[in-house]
């Protein structure tokens, strides 16, 4: 599992996450603590004996593939090639002292050699997740399926590009799960603060709809607020509220992150180090119903780092259902309670609050198999997907 010194096999959960992201499976509880012609498959001629999906040549072949670029690029961080332990150091504030210049009495001395060691907070990130993929390349068994070497070359290009696309989507899907884990962990902290659980402090989840209804004397639900007569005014208000929090992040405070008991640390996040992810359908609605009707467009154009089409699955795009890893007030990490959340609108966070580090990646080709007439190419990855709850971050929900 994560948060140990080992590098864990992640293929099972990776397959699960990718299937949910691509719609192969519907949303289910995911343990992120561990992370007009219709096409048809019916084939009316003989198949190649090796691949069993390539028709023997008839007239022409369309090679259906295009490069895929992974989303959540904003989570990529510096590559760490050596070791499996990364530490992060931060300074804690000291109390101010009385000025020793006064009073000064006769027969007394001022000690200027008093020792005062600074207080340091060290947080640690351990381990990583390992996974692999491999593909087989045949020497001549596919010759009967193509008309000439050029067409065979196009097939190999498509074949290889498909491998690259799957690798890109694997990183994207795990990065999406990293965000979902962060949202779930922040929700655990907010629930514990609300319940006055000892050691839990700060503000972690902002209920935009509750605040809006309180300030405006309305009783709108998440469904009501998206109606044409309500959405423009709500979105303008929500943008102003989020930008206010963005300004708050620039203040040096202990308010917007988790603190370790006895080692409270003041954080500030300059605007250029703030990232925001916003649910894209609401952003597109705003583009057509709100932004075009304002005199000062820049007022509502938040510098969005990433538009998010869905947080976990396309089937339920605004929802998550995860069992996150979470840091507790004593600084340890535990597997939290399952978090089922809906109506997630946006996530605002310090660039060091979460991310993806590819520790190592490489590929290698096997020797040619003379008996079988093929060779394999293996792709290996060691990734670390991480959250740091001691950095500033807020989750905005339509509740």
Predicted regions: what they are:
Residues 188-322:
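Extended, solvent-exposed, turn-rich assembly/linker loops in the middle of proteins
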Residues 1-68, 284-399:
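Extended, compositionally biased alpha-helical segments that mediate assembly or anchoring
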Residues 51-135:
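Assembly/oligomerization interface modules of large self-assembling protein complexes
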Residues 121-192, 376-380:
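Long, contiguous amphipathic alpha-helices that act as assembly "spine/axial" helices in icosahedral shell
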Residues 53, 57, 158, 208-211:
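Charge-rich, solvent-exposed alpha-helical interaction surfaces
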Residues 5-12, 41-45, 49, 53, ...:
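Alpha-helix boundary/N-cap detector
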């Amino acid at each position: 599992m994560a948060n140990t010194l080992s590098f864990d096999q992640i293929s099972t959960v990776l397959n699960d996450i990718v299937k949910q992201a691509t719609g192969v499976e519907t949303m289910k509880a995911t343990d992120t603590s561990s992370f007009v012609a219709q096409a048809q498959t019916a084939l009316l001629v003989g198949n190649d004996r090796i691949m069993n999906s390539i028709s023997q040549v008839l007239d022409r072949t369309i090679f259906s593939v295009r490069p895929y670029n992974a989303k959540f690029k904003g989570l990529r961080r510096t590559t760490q090639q050596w070791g499996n332990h990364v530490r992060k150091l931060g300074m804690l504030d000291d109390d101010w002292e009385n000025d020793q210049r006064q009073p000064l009495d006769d027969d007394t001395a001022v000690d200027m050699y008093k020792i005062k060691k600074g207080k340091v907070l060290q947080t640690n990130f351990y381990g990583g997740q390992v996974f692999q993929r491999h593909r087989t390349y045949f020497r001549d068994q596919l010759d009967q399926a193509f008309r000439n070497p050029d067409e065979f070359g196009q097939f190999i290009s498509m074949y290889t590009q498909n491998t690259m696309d799957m690798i890109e989507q694997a990183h994207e899907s795990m990065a999406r799960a990293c965000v979902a884990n962060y949202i779930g962990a922040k929700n655990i902290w907010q629930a514990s603060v609300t319940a006055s659980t000892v050691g839990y402090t700060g503000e972690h989840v902002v209920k935009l709809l509750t605040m809006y209804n309180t300030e405006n004397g309305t009783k709108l639900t998440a469904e009501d607020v998206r109606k044409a007569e309500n959405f423009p005014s709500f979105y303008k208000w929500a943008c102003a509220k989020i930008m206010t929090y963005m300004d708050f992040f620039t203040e040096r405070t202990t308010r917007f992150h988790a603190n370790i008991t006895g080692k409270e640390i003041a954080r500030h996040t300059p605007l250029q180090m703030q990232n925001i992810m916003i649910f894209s359908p609401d952003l597109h609605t705003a583009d057509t119903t709100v932004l075009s009707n304002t005199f000062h467009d820049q007022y509502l154009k938040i510098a969005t780092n990433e538009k998010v089409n869905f947080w976990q699955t396309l089937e339920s795009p605004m929802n998550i259902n995860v069992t996150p890893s979470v840091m507790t007030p004593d600084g340890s990490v535990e597997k939290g309670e399952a978090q089922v959340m809906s109506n997630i609108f946006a996530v605002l966070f310090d660039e060091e609050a979460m991310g993806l580090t590819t520790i190592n990646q490489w590929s290698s080709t096997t020797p040619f198999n003379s008996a079988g007439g093929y060779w394999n190419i293996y792709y290996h990855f060691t990734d670390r997907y991480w959250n740091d709850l001691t950095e500033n971050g807020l989750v905005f929900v339509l509740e």
